[in-house]
Swiss-Prot record:
Primary gene name: COX5A
UniProt cross-references to InterPro entries, sorted A to Z: Cyt_c_oxidase_su5A/6, Cyt_c_oxidase_su5A/6_sf
Superkingdom to which the source organism belongs: Eukaryota
Pathway in which this enzyme or protein is active: Energy metabolism; oxidative phosphorylation
One GO term describing the cellular component: respiratory chain complex IV
Residue intervals passing through the bilayer: none
Official protein name in the record: Cytochrome c oxidase subunit 5A, mitochondrial
Modified residues (Phosphothreonine): 141
Transit peptide: 1-41
Lineage: Eukaryota, Metazoa, Chordata, Craniata, Vertebrata
GO molecular function, one term: metal ion binding
Modifications the protein undergoes after translation, according to the UniProt entry: In response to mitochondrial stress, the precursor protein is ubiquitinated by the SIFI complex in the cytoplasm before mitochondrial import, leading to its degradation. Within the SIFI complex, UBR4 initiates ubiquitin chain that are further elongated or branched by KCMF1.
Similarity field: Belongs to the cytochrome c oxidase subunit 5A family.
Length: 150
């Protein structure tokens, strides 16, 4: 019902005619624009860090994961306000290798470097933790490929 009221307000605002008969948006909001905000709190339990890590490791370890699910998982993981744990990145890199998707491996490593932001010690730590996996899977870092100089 709230969505319908918002749609009516948006339609009414965009269909008002100006002096020459042209459509323009209204400068002053109508009475329907005075909708109060509603707080939507979840009363569910909070996910612990261990549960979060296990959920993502399980997601990337699915044997039947396809390229779309891999990219969706990576995109969702990147939207969180944190740097993923090395074990999550390890599982994602292994999923990329199962799908022979080298471009996604580079993208994951670049995203980790970007998420680390000004904290210059995080990315080298993650690479150090992932070095055995990178060597095992034959994955080069963006720095080894020269992509950091582009």
């Amino acid at each position: 019902m709230l969505g319908a009221a918002l749609r009516r307000c948006a339609v009414a605002a965009t269909t008002r005619a100006g002096p020459r008969g042209l459509l323009h948006s209204a400068r002053t909001p109508g009475p329907a624009a005075a909708i109060q905000s509603v707080r939507c709190y979840s009363h569910g339990s909070q996910e612990t860090d261990e549960e979060f890590d296990a959920r993502w490791v399980t997601y990337f370890n699915k044997p039947d994961i396809d390229a779309w699910e891999l990219r969706k998982g990576i995109n969702t993981l990147v939207t969180y306000d944190m740097v993923p744990e090395p074990k999550i990145i390890d599982a994602a890199l292994r999923a990329c290798r199962r799908l022979n998707d080298f471009a996604s491996t580079v993208r994951i490593l670049e995203a980790v470097k970007d998420k680390a932001g000004p904290h210059k010690e995080i990315y080298p730590y993650v690479i150090q933790e992932l070095r055995p996996t990178l060597n095992e899977l034959g994955i080069s870092t963006p720095e080894e490929l020269g992509l950091d100089k582009v």
